[in-house]
């Protein structure tokens, strides 16, 4: 199993915090960054290969993307300023093809128990919080017959739930999703989320929800998100 971590974005909503660095290199309590914490936890749970997509800060990420017992490959998206991570996923496809995959965003902060549950769960999985209020600007998911049917920031309703971009996928699901991503790229649709491709083929992926209610699992999109994560992590390292 490999990990695919998306770090091609500019982090514009973070203001001065990302004026000269990507979000993944923001410091956390204990002397780690978001990225180094992700890599440490992934490595501790047996992930030996990580593919990291990059954009404006390839050099900085290359300097700091280091972890014992883990082989790290960078995939640069030279069109980062004009594309969304659907294009980064397209570029990364040759490095992940044929592998089971953990796919996550580079600004995602999570506690160790999330990985423990995710890796122990059977089948393809997405991470959800069924008890959380639906966020206005972040991902929500919708289920049908117990499987993920749709992911979007625009979903609202009683059948929707908060979803964080952390997926466990087998090689067949990776292949199907990447094939649909390639179709979108061929049509020039490069400014959408990779989940737009997922939404066209949910029946091929069979992704079930994994409830992570009460656990730390949060994207850092704003300074307020960053402060909240810092406060949760400050008392302890894990």
Residue spans of the language-model regions?
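A structural signal for short hydrophobic beta-strand segments in well-ordered beta-sheet cores
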Residues: 25, 141-143, 209
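Phosphate- and divalent-cation-binding pockets in alpha/beta enzyme and binding domains
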Residues: 13, 60-63, 113, 176, ...
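Short beta->alpha linker loops
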Residues: 9, 30, 56, 80, ...
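Conserved core of the sugar-phosphate nucleotidyltransferase
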Residues: 111-188
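Conserved beta-loop-beta/alpha segment of the NTase-like Rossmann-fold superfamily
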Residues: 61-63, 68-139
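Conserved alpha/beta core of the MobA/IspD/sugar-nucleotide pyrophosphorylase nucleotidyltransferase superfamily
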Residues: 1-3, 162-238
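N-terminal glycine-rich phosphate-binding loop and ensuing alpha1 helix
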Residues: 1-58
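Residues at the starts of beta-strands that form the adenosine-phosphate
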Residues: 2, 48-51, 71, 100, ...
